[in-house]
């Protein structure tokens, strides 16, 4: 009996030691589609923070396309990683990502963009951490309307330019939420004009906005809606090119970190502000959830919606960015 007890104790000690060794050497991946974007740099920074706090190593890999994504999963497996968080470059890669991860017995959490299957249906079996796109869009519309009222614009001389990218689910939910909030506040639906952009960057939105502006020379004041800072900035640049003054334009972006140089300009522009979401929360939370899943077998919820957002303007952007650890970017 004494020998048996000692044997049990030895087994228990070995288990504890192997668990602590696993925690010491635990590696988890964090793959992002656009590492040059401040949003993803911040996610990486806070994934690292979670790693330091909880005791695991974060392997950060850029995955700008499908081939690099699948190669990155091979690399993670070769380095002994037990799972990864990913913002995929293409949601339709979802099935391939999941299949490859399963082949290596790795856990997967999607962040920012939801996987879809070959038929374009959301893969809701994969845990997802995501910005509350509709709610943030609604907030954009509410803030635009509030600032318009503050400036005392005549609604009959005003219009909304919504620069859309409806093929992207997140973009569609943001711009639709914004337009719905404007209508709910009392802005006339007939004065809300939509124009699709070929790309969600400044040049694409600039071209889209120019095509809209020439169709409506009667409009004296524009509210600009877009899915991110760059699309709204493209719209603002187009209005400047058509001779509009900053006081006659209100653009509010979404992202915040991409608006810093604009909000830092000596003179105010038509870009009034941006809704700063929480890449810090996304990076930390998704990594923490993956760690708990791998190390403690605590399966994460299938959907974690992040609603934290703050309006940053010329008056408060430095202070608000500092609060999120984004100061100096």
Label every PLM stretch briefly.
Residues 64-131, 229-235:
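Beta-alpha junction/loop-to-helix N-cap segments that form part of ligand/metal-binding clefts
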Residues 109-119, 225-272:
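Venus flytrap/periplasmic-binding-protein-like
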Residues 26-46, 50-54, 59-71, 75, ...:
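Extracytoplasmic "Venus flytrap"
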Residues 69, 128-157, 205-206, 255-261, ...:
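Hydrophobic alpha-helical segments within soluble ligand-binding/sensing domains
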Residues 39-54, 136-143, 169-189, 204, ...:
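Short, solvent-exposed amphipathic alpha-helices that sit
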Residues 29-30, 81-89, 107-111, 161-162, ...:
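Periplasmic-binding protein-like
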Residues 162-165, 170, 277-329:
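Hinge/cleft segment of the Venus flytrap/periplasmic-binding protein
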Residues 58-80, 195-216, 232-235, 259-260:
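Structural motif
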């Amino acid at each position: 009996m004494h020998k048996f007890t000692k044997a049990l104790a030895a087994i228990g000690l070995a288990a504890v030691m192997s668990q602590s060794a696993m925690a010491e050497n635990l590696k988890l991946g964090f793959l992002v589609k656009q590492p040059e974007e401040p949003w993803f740099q911040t996610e990486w920074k806070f994934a690292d923070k979670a790693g330091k706090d909880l005791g695991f190593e974060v392997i950060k890999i850029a995955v700008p396309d499908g081939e690099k994504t699948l190669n990155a999963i091979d690399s993670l497996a070769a380095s002994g990683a037990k799972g990864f968080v990913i913002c995929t470059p293409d949601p339709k890669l979802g099935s391939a990502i999941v299949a490859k991860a399963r082949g290596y017995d790795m856990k997967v959490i999607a962040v920012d963009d939801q996987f879809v299957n070959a038929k374009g249906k959301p893969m809701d079996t994969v845990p997802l951490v995501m910005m509350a796109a509709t709610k943030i869009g609604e907030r954009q519309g509410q803030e635009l309307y509030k600032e318009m009222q503050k400036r005392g614009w005549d609604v009959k001389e005003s219009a909304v330019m919504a620069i859309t990218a409806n093929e992207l689910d997140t973009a569609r939910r943001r711009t639709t939420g914004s337009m719905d909030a404007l209508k709910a506040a009392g802005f006339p639906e007939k004065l809300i004009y939509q124009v699709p952009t070929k790309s969600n960057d400044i040049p694409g939105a600039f071209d889209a906005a120019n095509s809209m502006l020439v169709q409506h020379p009667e409009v004296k004041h524009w509210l600009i809606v877009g899915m991110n800072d760059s699309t709204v900035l493209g719209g603002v640049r187009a209005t400047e090119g058509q001779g509009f003054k900053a006081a006659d334009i209100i653009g509010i972006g979404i992202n915040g970190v991409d608006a810093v140089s604009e909000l830092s300009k000596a003179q105010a522009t038509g870009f009034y502000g941006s809704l700063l979401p929480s890449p810090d929360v996304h990076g930390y939370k998704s990594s923490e959830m993956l760690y708990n899943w791998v190390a403690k077998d605590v399966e994460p919820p299938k959907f974690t919606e992040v609603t934290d957002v703050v309006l940053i303007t010329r008056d408060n952007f430095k202070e608000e960015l500092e609060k999120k650890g984004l100061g100096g970017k």
